[in-house]
Amino acid sequence: MTRYSRITGTGSYLPPRRLTNAELAAELATKGVETSDEWIVERTGIRARHFAAPDVSSSDLAVKAARHALEAAGRQASDIDLIIVATSTPDMVFPSAACIVQNKLGIAGCPAFDVQAVCSGFVYALTVADALIKTGSATKALVIGAEVFSRILDFSDRTTCVLFGDGAGAVVLEASETPGILASDLHADGKHVGILCVPGNVSGGQVLGDPLLKMDGQAVFKLAVGVLESSARAALAKANLRDTDIDWLIPHQANIRIMQSTAKKLKVPPEKLIVTVDEHGNTSAASIPLALDASVRSGKVKKGDTLMLEGVGGGFTWGAVLLNY
């Protein structure tokens, strides 16, 4: 019998501290950095973001999102036989955030590991989980995107520090007799490492070099729109579907301009584009599952809808997952 995988539950979590653009601008002004709500909204579409408390880690956010997803799926943590966490801001150099999440959920024995593809991380992780389920290596997977990007922001650089936020999103992906994940398409091109990176490195327990995020926004924008369209079309082709078959486009929530440009290229009408970047900011690997959970809980996304998830991030990495919800 052919095995498939299907999302059976979604969940998310945002730290309580919400910072509007005006509040962030006021904080930055005390450090001599000028920005404004108008400047940020015009360039990014972002109006607010959430920052985790200093004693809260990515695994803490991940566990809360995971519990919500488990509840939505009608499952207990003990039912899970695979945990994959997509993150670029893990609690420790090692062990993985996934192992820490596993322990906090009170389970043991199942495989647990991290995937690091920055903002493409969730589509990478979902693709890996789908493959493991299809081969019979797992039956019920927790796939989580979790980030505390506030820890790696340079708050003297207004072009980057206003963009990002913290949060986590999760799905329960289960073996199914009917197709849920229809197709996926993943790519990377390492020659673009320098346009979006944290250039520091860890040696002897210390961070050497610059530990804060660096980004060439124009270069990222130029690359992102093209690769997002091509990856989405590749996933559609693998599933023998057309862009008109997409019920909802749920892209990585980085910048409203990139999202709208991609939707236009895919001929997805504005009302079918899921947007949460205005309230969440760019939460990297957490952004797609956060947006998915928000759209499910709001009633926009319904069972049977065809969803296109797509991400692009540092590396340069990009990819798409086409699924029937």
UniProtKB/Swiss-Prot annotation:
<dbReference type="InterPro" id="IPR013751">
    <property type="entry name" value="ACP_syn_III_N"/>
</dbReference>
<keyword id="KW-0275">Fatty acid biosynthesis</keyword>
<keyword id="KW-0808">Transferase</keyword>
<comment type="function">
    <text>Catalyzes the condensation reaction of fatty acid synthesis by the addition to an acyl acceptor of two carbons from malonyl-ACP. Catalyzes the first condensation reaction which initiates fatty acid synthesis and may therefore play a role in governing the total rate of fatty acid production. Possesses both acetoacetyl-ACP synthase and acetyl transacylase activities. Its substrate specificity determines the biosynthesis of branched-chain and/or straight-chain of fatty acids.</text>
</comment>
<dbReference type="InterPro" id="IPR016039">
    <property type="entry name" value="Thiolase-like"/>
</dbReference>
<dbReference type="GO" id="GO:0005737">
    <property type="term" value="C:cytoplasm"/>
</dbReference>
<keyword id="KW-0012">Acyltransferase</keyword>
<dbReference type="GO" id="GO:0004315">
    <property type="term" value="F:3-oxoacyl-[acyl-carrier-protein] synthase activity"/>
</dbReference>
<feature type="active site">
    <location>
        <position position="282"/>
    </location>
</feature>
<keyword id="KW-0511">Multifunctional enzyme</keyword>
<feature type="region of interest" description="ACP-binding">
    <location>
        <begin position="253"/>
        <end position="257"/>
    </location>
</feature>
<feature type="active site">
    <location>
        <position position="119"/>
    </location>
</feature>
<dbReference type="Pfam" id="PF08541">
    <property type="entry name" value="ACP_syn_III_C"/>
</dbReference>
<keyword id="KW-0963">Cytoplasm</keyword>
<dbReference type="InterPro" id="IPR004655">
    <property type="entry name" value="FabH"/>
</dbReference>
<keyword id="KW-0443">Lipid metabolism</keyword>
<dbReference type="InterPro" id="IPR013747">
    <property type="entry name" value="ACP_syn_III_C"/>
</dbReference>
<comment type="pathway">
    <text>Lipid metabolism; fatty acid biosynthesis.</text>
</comment>
<protein>
    <recommendedName>
        <fullName>Beta-ketoacyl-[acyl-carrier-protein] synthase III</fullName>
        <ecNumber>2.3.1.180</ecNumber>
    </recommendedName>
</protein>
<comment type="subunit">
    <text>Homodimer.</text>
</comment>
<dbReference type="GO" id="GO:0033818">
    <property type="term" value="F:beta-ketoacyl-acyl-carrier-protein synthase III activity"/>
</dbReference>
<feature type="active site">
    <location>
        <position position="252"/>
    </location>
</feature>
<keyword id="KW-0276">Fatty acid metabolism</keyword>
<dbReference type="GO" id="GO:0006633">
    <property type="term" value="P:fatty acid biosynthetic process"/>
</dbReference>
<keyword id="KW-0444">Lipid biosynthesis</keyword>
<dbReference type="Pfam" id="PF08545">
    <property type="entry name" value="ACP_syn_III"/>
</dbReference>
<comment type="similarity">
    <text>Belongs to the thiolase-like superfamily. FabH family.</text>
</comment>
